[in-house]
Amino acid sequence: MSPKKKAVVLLSGGLDSATTMAIAKAENYELYALTFQYGQRHAVELEAARRIAAALGAKEHLFISIDLRIIGGSALTGPFEVPKKQEGEETSAEIPVTYVPARNTIFLSYALAWAEVLQISEIFIGVNAVDYSGYPDCRPEYITAFEAMANLAIKAAVEGTMRVKIRTPLIDLSKADIIRKGMALSVDYGLTHSCYDPLPDGKPCGQCDSCHLRRKGFREAGFDDPAFSET
């Protein structure tokens, strides 16, 4: 019997990462979930990540703490206000203040290190270049560049015992398509959290970019969003 396939999966607790993890599970990977506590104001997503990992049967779930508040530069980790807008209001084409400097590079670097230790060649990340907020580290060319760097940077790749592959199953999907994919895989989106600036009780604000993208996706996919069923 051939050994079971294994994958490191970046799991934030949000809709995209939950769907990505469900896709990896459907492809019969043994799941090694990786979640970061980086000083984000929406720390409620950490508990969401814990619930998702348990529901999808992760073999291991590693939490890593990095205080990116020290660096600042983002509304998610600093004193800036998270932008709010009304339903139907256009999203700016500029990179928003919710961009966290080099976040995916930092996260993928930790994932790469853990994957090398575990001798796992595939890393799943739920980046999306269609319905997204303009983040530069969600683009296909960024992923291609990181993968090339990874295979120059680690001992296993240089020695030829492992070739790293960064898997991005959502990269070309709309938010509605992501939700349809997840529903087909029985993802419980009631476990997920997407809001950048949750209310004191942990419920979504309903006005940040992430809330708007999520609502729009569920509406276009033809499903009710459990995050807003009681808000």
Swiss-Prot record:
In this chain, ATP is annotated as bound at: L11, S12, G13, G14, L15, D16, S17, A18, T19, T20, M21
Q: Which Enzyme Commission number(s) are on file for it?
A: 6.3.4.20
- List GO BP terms, alphabetically: queuosine biosynthetic process
Per its UniProt record, what InterPro entries does this chain match? QueC, Rossmann-like_a/b/a_fold
Under which pathway is this protein filed?
Purine metabolism; 7-cyano-7-deazaguanine biosynthesis
Give the matching Pfam families. QueC
Query: What does the UniProt cofactor note say?
Result: Binds 1 zinc ion per subunit.
Q: Which cofactor does it need?
A: Zn(2+)
Q: Name the reaction it catalyses.
A: 7-carboxy-7-deazaguanine + NH4(+) + ATP = 7-cyano-7-deazaguanine + ADP + phosphate + H2O + H(+)
What is a single molecular function from GO for this protein?
ligase activity, forming carbon-nitrogen bonds
Which positions does UniProt annotate for Zn(2+) binding?
C195, C205, C208, C211
Q: What does this protein do?
A: Catalyzes the ATP-dependent conversion of 7-carboxy-7-deazaguanine (CDG) to 7-cyano-7-deazaguanine (preQ(0)).
Name this protein carries in UniProt: 7-cyano-7-deazaguanine synthase
